[in-house]
Amino acid sequence: MAKIDKKTKLKLNKKSVRAPSKPTTEKKPKKYVTADTLTWKPVKTSSFSGIDGGGGMMMLEELEDVGIEWEETDGGRKIAKFVEVESKTSKGKKNAAQEEPNQEGRGDDEKASSASETEEGKKADDKEAVEEDDEEEFPDFAGFAEEDLNAADEEEHPNLDDEPAFNDDLLPEWSSISLHPSLKRSFLASSFTAPTAIQSRAIPAGITGRDVVGVAETGSGKTLAYSLPILHYLLGQRKSKAGIKRPLSALVLCPTRELALQVMDHLNALLKHALATPDGEKPQGPPRVSVGSVVGGLSAQKQKRILERGCDVIVATPGRLWDLIKADDELATSVRTLRFLVIDEADRMIENGHFAELESIVKLTQRSTAQQGPDDDDPVFQAMATLFEESTAREDMQTFVFSATLSKDLQKNLKRRSRSWKGKGKRSSTLEDLVEKLDFRDENPEVIDLSPEGGVVSSLRESMIESTKDDKDLYLYYFLLRYPGRSIVFVNSIDSIRRLLPLFTLLQLPVFPLHSHLQQKQRLKNLDRFKSNPKGILIATDVAARGLDIPQVDHVVHFNLPRTADAYIHRSGRTARAQNEGFALQLVSPDEKSVQRALMKSLERTHELPDLPIEAGFLPSLRERLRVATEIEKAQHRATKATHDKNWLLEAAEAMDIDIDPSMLDGEDDDPDAPYYKPKKQDRGKGKASVENLKMELKALLQEKLVARGVSIRYPTSGSKVIVDDLIKSTGHGMLLGASTSKAYDQVEKTGKRKLGSGRPGAVKKKKVEGR
């Protein structure tokens, strides 16, 4: 009998075992789904609202196991459709179930290899499951389905009655304010040991149900003054039951996107410590209090999903919020039944071009809509008429209005709650119109006026330098070198920024622009660079004057004087924040003297600002540096303009489908009247060589030491100023040899000695000639 080897036997066994026929499966129909029904996962980004390394990309979400098909419409446009795709995990389980009956027909070797593969696959599945768990570790409530949110909320948060009490001895300054214990634990973790003046007065009124109108300088803690009563109320409420959407409790309206994101960051930072577990870790699951933002520049689709899943506090800008309200009746109902309405930076809000949207949002919160208004013919309000009949505004809604400026007359009228004060012959301001439309539930709102005398805080020192218009660059350069630190230079036009920026860049100063024509991504990047540089210089228009909380700003320079007192207050308020010292400098040219005098009178000043002492010995060297840098900047500007003109001519010709005469581009004729004037080649060569020579000259000037008068570099122990001790101890000025290291704050007194409008001592006064 022939011997059969093992391999032949294995082949025979395989042939004898007939493979089962594949079941005939029909192709499943495609299942289309909408974007709102999908489970979106938030993409983890870095801190500060996603701008640290995120390039301005914020609040991104991603999808898995979803296909996309593009359907072309009659007009040629393509519409994306989401197709449900079977996930890899479920598909793998089905395949394993189908292959299970076939395991008996395999050989021993094949079974062993299959077992090892199954074990490896199991490990891989476990690894994927762990990675998915890590991805779904809760960074934002928007990444969870509504059922998961409510179920996790029931499991993670204990009964509120079991909340442990807080030992007030740890924070004695907060003992008089009966806030939720979790908030006080957050204060302790954040080293927030004492409330500010506005907080100590606004918070007790807010937690007792009063309406509050607060007036305080910038940087005084107004954000927490209205946020803490809201969080105190929300933390005192019981958690929502499973399957019930979170109701919108508070709406915070801000004038700009940057301020709205900043407020949301403050709230989340406070809640992070307040809701932390005893071991200091962040609790798993959705937050007890959810905070979201609705601002322009981000995906409206994502913001709709956030609102649909439910949110306790919404921080929004009026424009984007009103766009969403017009498309969503449920959101309009949520706004109508608010528990808290906050208007932050009210004076800025009415200047930002969103007064119409703000007025419409405020109208939703009014208890009575019987009065006729200019928006009654709006189809949006007509569509909401039946909705308003079904839902009524809350009687216990609290309104918080905070601003850096508010007229005294308006404050008095708010206290009296007199509705007849507008028709006294005096035209009301837009801010007064806004406050008049607010339906305060409190008959006598708590008006807290902590605005400082003279419009600025006591820790701010002001000074001025009187110079000609052409010498402003020189004195600005001197100030930035003499007093290094984080400084903001305010100008009145974008053209001034475009002129100063290349000039001071050539002088090797860390300057960054900020104005409204910059893209949002570039604005955030420049702000981030300015914050990270302790000697950074921000040249900005009034877009940076309000709302932005930039820490540790040492100086504010008014290169051009503002036209209003409010703008001056907000500009100067970028420094001396949170009881820190600050310095504000005015550069005043002769044609601005009348503007400055009117500005000071509107601030109720009686004395001129003190002059900043100038060490004139440094000015000649600085003037020479500026002269060379200005020539370089002008030459580069001419070259850039010539290239721009040429490119414009080529693009215009291409758009009109015409040919250009080559002589217009390549001609050697030196004809300034030609459509495109092109200098001769030798002249262009001379221009390039001249710029290179100027750059070498500027480099040499920048390497030279700037020495004060009376100082000898070769003989430091002699001369009228002895600097040998400063050189040995390295205590002298880093840029100006022989200059003192005192701060600008210490160089001037709080108030000047000359009365406002009295003129300088020794100046020749013009005699008034009487007419005949």
From Swiss-Prot:
<keyword id="KW-0347">Helicase</keyword>
<protein>
    <recommendedName>
        <fullName>ATP-dependent RNA helicase MAK5</fullName>
        <ecNumber>3.6.4.13</ecNumber>
    </recommendedName>
</protein>
<dbReference type="InterPro" id="IPR027417">
    <property type="entry name" value="P-loop_NTPase"/>
</dbReference>
<feature type="domain" description="Helicase C-terminal">
    <location>
        <begin position="473"/>
        <end position="618"/>
    </location>
</feature>
<keyword id="KW-0690">Ribosome biogenesis</keyword>
<feature type="short sequence motif" description="DEAD box">
    <location>
        <begin position="344"/>
        <end position="347"/>
    </location>
</feature>
<feature type="compositionally biased region" description="Basic residues">
    <location>
        <begin position="8"/>
        <end position="17"/>
    </location>
</feature>
<feature type="compositionally biased region" description="Basic and acidic residues">
    <location>
        <begin position="103"/>
        <end position="112"/>
    </location>
</feature>
<feature type="region of interest" description="Disordered">
    <location>
        <begin position="748"/>
        <end position="772"/>
    </location>
</feature>
<keyword id="KW-0698">rRNA processing</keyword>
<feature type="domain" description="Helicase ATP-binding">
    <location>
        <begin position="203"/>
        <end position="424"/>
    </location>
</feature>
<keyword id="KW-0539">Nucleus</keyword>
<comment type="function">
    <text>ATP-binding RNA helicase involved in the biogenesis of 60S ribosomal subunits and is required for the normal formation of 25S and 5.8S rRNAs.</text>
</comment>
<dbReference type="GO" id="GO:0005524">
    <property type="term" value="F:ATP binding"/>
</dbReference>
<keyword id="KW-0378">Hydrolase</keyword>
<dbReference type="InterPro" id="IPR001650">
    <property type="entry name" value="Helicase_C-like"/>
</dbReference>
<dbReference type="GO" id="GO:0005730">
    <property type="term" value="C:nucleolus"/>
</dbReference>
<feature type="region of interest" description="Disordered">
    <location>
        <begin position="84"/>
        <end position="138"/>
    </location>
</feature>
<feature type="short sequence motif" description="Q motif">
    <location>
        <begin position="172"/>
        <end position="200"/>
    </location>
</feature>
<feature type="region of interest" description="Disordered">
    <location>
        <begin position="1"/>
        <end position="30"/>
    </location>
</feature>
<feature type="compositionally biased region" description="Basic residues">
    <location>
        <begin position="752"/>
        <end position="772"/>
    </location>
</feature>
<dbReference type="GO" id="GO:0003723">
    <property type="term" value="F:RNA binding"/>
</dbReference>
<dbReference type="InterPro" id="IPR011545">
    <property type="entry name" value="DEAD/DEAH_box_helicase_dom"/>
</dbReference>
<keyword id="KW-0694">RNA-binding</keyword>
<keyword id="KW-0547">Nucleotide-binding</keyword>
<feature type="region of interest" description="Disordered">
    <location>
        <begin position="663"/>
        <end position="689"/>
    </location>
</feature>
<feature type="compositionally biased region" description="Acidic residues">
    <location>
        <begin position="663"/>
        <end position="673"/>
    </location>
</feature>
<feature type="binding site">
    <location>
        <begin position="216"/>
        <end position="223"/>
    </location>
    <ligand>
        <name>ATP</name>
    </ligand>
</feature>
<comment type="similarity">
    <text>Belongs to the DEAD box helicase family. DDX24/MAK5 subfamily.</text>
</comment>
<dbReference type="GO" id="GO:0006364">
    <property type="term" value="P:rRNA processing"/>
</dbReference>
<dbReference type="Pfam" id="PF00270">
    <property type="entry name" value="DEAD"/>
</dbReference>
<keyword id="KW-0067">ATP-binding</keyword>
<dbReference type="InterPro" id="IPR014001">
    <property type="entry name" value="Helicase_ATP-bd"/>
</dbReference>
<dbReference type="GO" id="GO:0016887">
    <property type="term" value="F:ATP hydrolysis activity"/>
</dbReference>
<dbReference type="GO" id="GO:0003724">
    <property type="term" value="F:RNA helicase activity"/>
</dbReference>
<dbReference type="Pfam" id="PF00271">
    <property type="entry name" value="Helicase_C"/>
</dbReference>
<feature type="compositionally biased region" description="Acidic residues">
    <location>
        <begin position="128"/>
        <end position="138"/>
    </location>
</feature>
<dbReference type="InterPro" id="IPR000629">
    <property type="entry name" value="RNA-helicase_DEAD-box_CS"/>
</dbReference>
